């Protein structure tokens, strides 16, 4: 039986590169992965993925966060064969699809980000 809480449970993080948290990179998969670990969330892990995608979208009144016919087909593909593999490694070799097309965008180099967090190195 799925573990679907009776309330809209969400996991969030200040995972941005700013003066409050200069180590972030806006990686929602990392937020979900850390949430599962830190909050000791259990099977079925797929139910808890909603806590970082469709649950926040619902709270904001957005029709996003789920794949659906005619939707934008924004998703992440990984080599993981199951949820334990997905959650035990960062999956840095993932493929990001935007509107169904593989994105070739790469994260900026750290040199490009120098000074953005408001802290000197």
Sequence positions of predicted segments:
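His/Asp/Glu-enriched, well-ordered alpha-helical/loop segment
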Residues: 1-78
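Active-site microenvironment of metallo-dependent hydrolases
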Residues: 46-121
């Amino acid at each position: 039986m799925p573990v679907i809480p009776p309330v809209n449970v969400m996991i969030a993080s200040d995972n941005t590169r700013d003066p409050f948290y200069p180590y972030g990179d806006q990686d929602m998969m990392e937020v979900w992965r850390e949430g599962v670990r830190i909050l000791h969330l259990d099977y079925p892990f797929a139910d808890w993925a909603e806590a970082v995608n469709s649950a926040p979208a619902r709270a904001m009144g957005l029709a996003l966060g789920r794949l659906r016919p005619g939707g934008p087909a924004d998703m992440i593909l990984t080599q993981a064969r199951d949820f334990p593999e997905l959650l035990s490694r960062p999956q840095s070799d993932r493929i990001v699809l935007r509107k169904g097309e593989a994105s070739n965008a790469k994260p900026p180099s750290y040199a490009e980000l120098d000074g953005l967090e408001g802290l000197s190195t």
